[in-house]
Regions:
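Terminal-tail/helix-coil boundary detector
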Residues: 207-220
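GST-like domain detector, emphasizing the conserved glutathione-binding G-site
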Residues: 1-132
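GST-like fold's C-terminal all-alpha helical module
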Residues: 101-200
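Conserved beta-strand edge residues that scaffold enzyme active sites
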Residues: 33-34, 171, 215-216
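Residue-level signal for nonpolar/aromatic packing positions in well-ordered secondary structure
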Residues: 19, 56, 69, 153, ...
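Residues at helix-coil transition
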Residues: 74-78, 158, 202-203
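Residue-level recognition of oxygen-bearing side chains
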Residues: 68, 193, 206
Length: 220
């Protein structure tokens, strides 16, 4: 049976949601972040050399990286569900947003988190300098980039109910975490379509089932 090596408050929540949407049986092995470093525990390195989550094992197969995991699950268990037909405009949108989630949306969000943490982890004497540098990077670079990406997402959802058309797809599953992360840090602002989309996915029975099985998740 497929096993999800699940880290609390992490991208792996999306994998649980996808499996619930598809009705695929799975096991969960829970891992907890270190309370100080917020990093994954070393036990995960026994599953994959990088020791990060998400990672799944399915028989003798181990798959890491959320996008690769989503592709694997859709191909192995989807039976044509949650993916638009090949050659359609919806399929191109699906491919774009599936990769946008980690390729474009997440990096500035992670950098925002890191620059916010740096002043807490350096000597008090130079902490004001750390705050100044972090604030400048956030104001001049990261903040505008995140806003531009959220505006793009809002514009896309003005075209249709979901990111790849009128039906939920795995692209929406991938996009859930960056939108949730952005919302938790600075809110979605005056972006009604994006806000409505987030509320709608959170209300789905499969999403709620994944929350119950996954445990602590600060973004929903």
């Amino acid at each position: 049976m497929l096993t999800v090596h699940h880290l609390n408050n992490s991208r792996s929540q999306r994998v649980l949601w996808l499996l619930e949407e598809l009705g695929v049986p799975y096991d969960i092995k829970h891992y907890q972040r270190d309370a100080k470093s917020m990093l994954a525990p070393p036990e995960l390195r026994a599953v994959h050399p990088l020791g990060k989550s998400p990672v799944i094992t399915d028989g003798g197969t181990t798959v890491a990286e959320t996008g690769a995991i989503v592709d694997y699950i859709i191909e192995a268990y989807g039976n044509g569900r949650l993916i638009p037909a090949t050659g359609t405009p919806e399929r191109l949108r699906y491919t774009y947003w599936l990769h946008f989630a980690e390729g474009s949306a997440m990096p500035p969000l992670v950098m925002t988190l890191l620059f916010g943490e740096i002043p807490k982890r350096i000597p008090a004497l130079i902490r004001p300098i750390g705050k100044l540098i972090g604030g400048t990077v956030q104001k001049t670079y990261l903040g505008p980039m995140i806003d531009a990406q959220l505006d793009l997402e809002e514009a896309e959802l003005n075209k249709s109910t979901y990111f790849a058309g009128e039906d939920l797809t795995a692209a929406d599953v991938m996009m859930s975490f960056p939108v949730e992360a952005a919302n938790s840090r600075a809110s979605l602002g005056t972006r009604p379509k994006l806000t409505a989309w987030l509320k709608s996915i959170h209300a789905r029975p499969a999403y709620q089932a994944a929350l119950k099985k996954g445990g602590t998740y600060a973004y929903a």
